[in-house]
Amino acid sequence: MLLVIDVGNSNIVLGIYDGELLVRHWRISTDKSRTSDEYGVMLNSLFSLASLSFSQVKAIIISSVVPPLTGVLESLCRDFFALPPYVVGPGIKTGMQIQYDNPREVGADRVVNAVAGFEKHRSPLIIVDFGTATTFDYVNSKGEYCGGAIAPGLAISLEALFQRASKLPRVDICRPPHAIAKNTVNSMQAGIFYGYVGLVDGIVERIKLESRDQPRVLATGGLAALIAPESKTIDEVDEFLTLEGLRILYERNR
């Protein structure tokens, strides 16, 4: 079995693949203060609840946008699984040309998503990943990663509104019933939610215009299922796109 680990700023998503089949997946909070032993104990509990054992894992691949945790998780892999993990970054064969001023600047998660998206669809794509930041990535018909845009995530935007406007409360992220809201909480939710839908559609349309193409638009990430139904541009939600990309990269580098 293959263990794939996607380390984001807010969450770590883990998956277990048996061949091409994703058999289990988990989402835990990202905590830079945890040690490799603490993550190991947590992972042992998750494995036990799923009737899995560490000995069943024969390979591990990690994508991380949190550098302090990369080494911690590498230690976890060596100490608990006795395996050196593959880490997405320089030296990993992606099979994709990166059309970027400095390819090393492209986040590992963005490359992983691009690889998975093109492998599955074999057509031009825009991939919208709703994470701590929301990323927009364009892959052309040749399968080349062409760049994209980065915007503040939905949660960051909502938290900034609470922090910087002293009379406004902290509210949950949800789809409000109306854009013309009748109370402060719904007004904030309407502004953030519908404003963010407009941001997504606006950036996607601009990328389409600049690309002179009609790419398929994939959405992934924790809040994709919330935003996609209101979006005019998102064609499909792929919840496990990043995990699938890690599996594909493992196959290309094993």
UniProtKB/Swiss-Prot annotation:
For this chain, the annotated S-S bridges are: none
Cofactor(s) needed? NH4(+); K(+)
Name the residues annotated as catalytic in the UniProt entry.
109 (proton acceptor)
- State the Gene Ontology terms under molecular function: ATP binding; metal ion binding; pantothenate kinase activity
Report the locations given in the UniProt record: Cytoplasm
Residues binding K(+):
129
A GO term (biological process) for this protein? coenzyme A biosynthetic process
Q: How is the cofactor bound?
A: A monovalent cation. Ammonium or potassium.
Pathway given for this chain reads:
Cofactor biosynthesis; coenzyme A biosynthesis; CoA from (R)-pantothenate: step 1/5
Residues that coordinate or bind substrate:
100, 107-110, 184
This enzyme catalyses: (R)-pantothenate + ATP = (R)-4'-phosphopantothenate + ADP + H(+)
How does this protein assemble? Homodimer.
Task performed by this protein: Catalyzes the phosphorylation of pantothenate (Pan), the first step in CoA biosynthesis.
Q: Which PANTHER family match?
A: TYPE III PANTOTHENATE KINASE
Question: What protein am I looking at?
Answer: Type III pantothenate kinase
